[in-house]
Amino acid sequence: MSWQAYVDEHLMCEIEGHHLTSAAIVGHDGAVWAQSTAFPQFKTEEMTNIMKDFDEPGFLAPTGLFLGPTKYMVIQGEPGAVIRGKKGSGGITVKKTGQALVIGIYDEPMTPGQCNMVVERLGDYLLEQGL
């Protein structure tokens, strides 16, 4: 299965009638492996900061998580494994695997829990596959 198929079929899939706004799988180096059409253009520095938060949990808390034009307030995640962010009625979930970051961005009517489930399910699967 191609990386694009993972994004299209596993991240952008329908959950209780709702979809993520956008999603991507990005290497630890910031290289995009696959993304949905609406996934924001981001700076390499933004991915570097996300990776730093996985290594040093709490690193992003004072400044927020920036991805493209959006700043998310970092909320409770799982140190070293999952970063969650909130902005208005939407937010972001980032799951770290051995080689990649699985990223999902949502807005109402999708809930934070639905976004977490979709992103973390694929992230856990990739971890099981040694990726």
From Swiss-Prot:
Phosphothreonine modifications at: 111
Post-translational modification: Phosphorylated by MAP kinases.
Alphabetized InterPro entries for the sequence: PFN (IPR048278), PFN_euk (IPR005455), PFN_sf (IPR036140), Profilin_CS (IPR027310)
Coiled-coil intervals, chain numbering: none
Alphabetized GO MF terms: actin monomer binding; proline-rich region binding
UniProt keyword annotation of Cytoplasm present: yes
GO biological process, one term: regulation of actin cytoskeleton organization
Compartments where found: Cytoplasm, Cytoskeleton
CC per GO annotation: cell cortex; cytoskeleton
Disulfide bond as UniProt keyword: yes
Keywords: Actin-binding, Allergen, Cytoplasm, Cytoskeleton, Disulfide bond, Phosphoprotein
Disulfide bonds: 13-115
One Pfam family in the UniProt entry: Profilin
Span(s) of short sequence motif Involved in PIP2 interaction: 81-97
Superkingdom of origin organism: Eukaryota
Further comment found in the protein's record: The variability of the residues taking part of IgE-binding epitopes might be responsible of the difference in cross-reactivity among olive pollen cultivars, and between distantly related pollen species, leading to a variable range of allergy reactions among atopic patients.
Subunit architecture: Occurs in many kinds of cells as a complex with monomeric actin in a 1:1 ratio.
Family that this chain belongs to: Belongs to the profilin family.
Protein role: Binds to actin and affects the structure of the cytoskeleton. At high concentrations, profilin prevents the polymerization of actin, whereas it enhances it at low concentrations.
Stated name of the protein: Profilin-10
